[in-house]
Amino acid sequence: MPELPEVETTRRGIAPHLVGQRVSRVVVRDRRLRWPIPEDLDVRLSGQCIVSVERRAKYLLINAEVGTLISHLGMSGNLRLVELGLPAAKHEHVDIELESGLMLRYTDPRRFGAMLWSLDPLNHELLIRLGPEPLTDLFDGERLFQLSRGRSMAVKPFIMDNAVVVGVGNIYATEALFAAGIDPRREAGGISRARYLKLAIEIKRVLAAAIEQGGTTLRDFIGGDGQPGYFQQELFVYGRGGQPCKVCGTELREVKLGQRASVFCPKCQR
């Protein structure tokens, strides 16, 4: 599933080609995503100029003069720019055609993504309850420490809770916990302030590094320019269960936490 770095990579890739451009037509070949694409999307968006492209958590907000297209890549989706008129292949559900001669094409083989329309996107039901962005000053270790008091859940699902902080998905939670030396199974409420301060720093560092590398391509993620991400080459623990730790050589263990696989080093993480 594309996580925050992959979505931010997509945003950075498509924004320069969208902002200031006018939409000439929207072609929807299949409306059946996680939620149906609005039947009047073409009417609402065509003729409008794209003002900005923003990201909130794992949602892309394509802001027009009036209204915003809210897009989510789901489990396997991508948005990329192609030449106008390029024939559509299987699973290529939506084309947003631009007067510039390019079009933004949405592909989603598993159809778990979304394309919705809103006049007030930040107050949309999908976005209004989200926590702070991890790469801003609104998120820090003190927030993690305070929100974790009295919580008996494991620390990994705690930091993956979008009400606590957005965008810390399975890959980056696994990597940040390793970097901070924290066992993902530990109770969130039993971790000290000092360790949460360290964890917040590592969450920011890991996410920033992943964005710099264009995200992580494990299966079918590609950025807005059609290129894969390269952060998978930097992974220390994610997806490496049973292999030796890159730091100490101990065999990495894999357990289930919150229905997700979690890999950790029993020596480096306490």
Swiss-Prot record:
CDD domains per the UniProt record, alphabetical? EcFpg-like_N
**Zn finger (FPG-type) start-end:** 236-270
Necessary cofactors:
Zn(2+)
Q: Name one GO molecular function term.
A: class I DNA-(apurinic or apyrimidinic site) endonuclease activity
Biological process (GO) annotations?
A: base-excision repair
Which EC number(s) does UniProt give?
3.2.2.23, 4.2.99.18
What is this protein's function?
Answer: Involved in base excision repair of DNA damaged by oxidation or by mutagenic agents. Acts as a DNA glycosylase that recognizes and removes damaged bases. Has a preference for oxidized purines, such as 7,8-dihydro-8-oxoguanine (8-oxoG). Has AP (apurinic/apyrimidinic) lyase activity and introduces nicks in the DNA strand. Cleaves the DNA backbone by beta-delta elimination to generate a single-strand break at the site of the removed base with both 3'- and 5'-phosphates.
Tell me its family: Belongs to the FPG family.
According to UniProt, the name of this protein is Formamidopyrimidine-DNA glycosylase
